[in-house]
Curated annotation (Swiss-Prot):
Residues 1-7 are cytoplasmic. This is Cytochrome c-type biogenesis protein CcmE. It comes from the Bacteria. Gene3D superfamilies: Nucleic acid-binding proteins. Residues 29-170 are periplasmic. Keywords: Cell inner membrane, Cell membrane, Cytochrome c-type biogenesis, Heme, Iron, Membrane, Metal-binding, Signal-anchor, Transmembrane, Transmembrane helix. Heme chaperone required for the biogenesis of c-type cytochromes. Transiently binds heme delivered by CcmC and transfers the heme to apo-cytochromes in a process facilitated by CcmF and CcmH. Belongs to the CcmE/CycJ family. Signal peptide: none annotated. GO terms for biological process: cytochrome complex assembly. NCBIfam families: PRK13254.1-1, PRK13254.1-5.
Amino acid sequence: MTRKKRRLILIAACGSVLALAVGLILYAMSGSIVFFRSPTDIAKQAIAPGTRLRLGGLVKDGSLRRGPDQTVDFAVTDTNETVEVHYKGLLPDLFREGQGVVAEGVLEPGGQFRADTVLAKHDESYMPREVADALKAQGRWQEGGPNRGGPAPKPATAAADSTLGPRSER
């Protein structure tokens, strides 16, 4: 066997082992991959009930309803479509109506979403691009985050607010 032929066989064997390793890794991860969807994606695509996914958008104003035993119902919207969400548990401190949210759970028959994890958006990095684009088109978005229709509140400082107490300078 010539040196060139041995090298070719070695390269082919290494390539086969690498392809097998990548295939096994992807197969092992396929059960834990959770796809991200917006309410419009859920409405337009035929997603089977029981499918595990992440739902992202804004908590619709006026949709938050608290029930017994820490149950919470609310609606997530991307300004085009809305999905009803049912969640049992403690909500994050930053969770409120009009705020961005990502909920992970299962799509149930009838289009309702049963969430087992809710994450509140605290900066624009959690906002899905489609939702941010829709908010920009409606004029509800300014650079740095959604626009609530008024100026941003000024931060409270000891010098500006006497209720915080005197400012000590050393």
